[in-house]
UniProtKB/Swiss-Prot annotation:
GO terms for cellular component: ribonucleoprotein complex; ribosome. It comes from Desulfitobacterium hafniense (strain Y51). Keywords: Ribonucleoprotein, Ribosomal protein, RNA-binding, rRNA-binding. Pfam families: Ribosomal_L4. One of the primary rRNA binding proteins, this protein initially binds near the 5'-end of the 23S rRNA. It is important during the early stages of 50S assembly. It makes multiple contacts with different domains of the 23S rRNA in the assembled 50S subunit and ribosome. This is Large ribosomal subunit protein uL4. Residues 56-76 are annotated as: Disordered. Signal peptide: none annotated.
Amino acid sequence: MPKVQVVNMQGSPVGELELDEYVFGIEPNTHVMHQAVVGQLASQRRGTHSTLLRGEVRGGGRKPWRQKGTGRARAGSIRSPLWRGGAVLFGPKPRKYGFSLPKKVRRLALRSALSSKVNEQKLIVLEDLSLNEAKTREMVKVLQALNVSKKALIVTDEFMETIERSARNIAGIKTTAVEGMNIYDLLNSDVIVMTKAAVTKTEEVLA
């Protein structure tokens, strides 16, 4: 079973934690992770693009000139797709891009992402994370003590307003509860900072 060091808010080690191998120690499935990321990003697309078809463009009901005798190419409408200001053939229409993956696949993707972070030694487990007040400088002190200077995802066992408000003004830092954890944020972060309680809850949810 994989083990990680547990540290306090000052960055000092306070013990070790054995991780559930089924959640944090599997062979990462890159194909499933890719599918999950594509699905998440696709569901975020607005899909509001729209073009006008032949029947939707205003005007163009009258034949612009007679069929023969003018020396010009024949034309039946000034709203032909060939004309400037004309219709669009096979253009985009509003649609939903999102697609759903089976629950087992989504969970496998999350387990793969967490396992890859453990393999890369990019998972930091905090004994506890509690701030007296929602101040950015308080969170900065904690991150500096943990040597976190890049993009990081802070995961707590439940939503904590003081943590969220303390971190939201720090560039590259995101916070989430275990229930809100998603594949894109996990893979897009250089470091994952999880509380000990969050690790336990994650194992309960994904095991």
